[in-house]
């Protein structure tokens, strides 16, 4: 039976679109499937660190202000009675600015970028499962059904075939689950909720992070596990949310939407986060972290982005790593395409797992240790109270948490972080 493409990518989020883009750039025929019709909303903080900005630049994505992007110069941190502003570091490896753009338009930009590179995009196509070759046990395609905007069936089932399938289908990953790749319980798991507000400070140049969440008046009530964020979007609105992380797959037992409401009652008044200015409901999502589903590649099926649990335990960012994974996946697939034998092609595809483990495995292990420490609110309070006033400590913390440091060379802070990622066991 003939293949429909060299590679099928399931899911049009950042990881899937990046995979499709790079595969198309390498001259491969690509089929990108997504059940939604773009633009569509996704729960996210919408803020991008310099690491994500670098990945977008590598893809050739334009992020001009007139196209709805806003740049940020660093992180404003509030906690322990302190309020400090930490500029993004000047490094050779990364730009010295971050970005923000609502996911509704951000994902559409990336899908269209992949389409322009030559990927065939089928929207409104819900993948229902993998096609598995009976003799080899390899994934050789997917089954799917057309759906309307409400997810209702809109046509007959269809089958698509390709020698490689990439699962970029999110935290639940129907494809990964269907072949027995379940989530690991020993990896961190986060939870985040967010909404949007109109605000006069929509063009604020700093990503604001609140390291302490109180269940009432700050300093006079109980500390809760988690952190809050305010990311200005430059379009009259800001993304406002809070998150929490657990060192295992068992989420903390907190009503986050209720906590969000209480936090907003004591939010900085200058932001004008009032019920009248809120746009849409508070929505939540799980944040799979630290490679919580493995193997990243086996028997024709690759995992990228949330399907592989690639969110950083340090800061809850997943986009940068999804884009990076898409780049690495496409490189492995392109190399496999030109190999003369099945064994040689398989060796090339397996380099994806090794590459991602080398790039991020040590960092994610450090992140797990970090989460074990800060998941206790009392420890977080002590760290912020005594750590924030110390410039060298915060320089180290910013680079570690944002994963923005020189991977080789650099100053003493860069060398310490790079060294730590190499001496711990890779996730």
Language model feature labels by segment:
Residues 113-270:
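Predominantly flavin-linked oxidoreductase catalytic cores and closely associated redox partners
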Residues 24-44:
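Glycine-rich FAD pyrophosphate-binding loop
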Residues 53, 58-108:
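A conserved beta-strand/loop capping segment in the N-terminal third of enzymes
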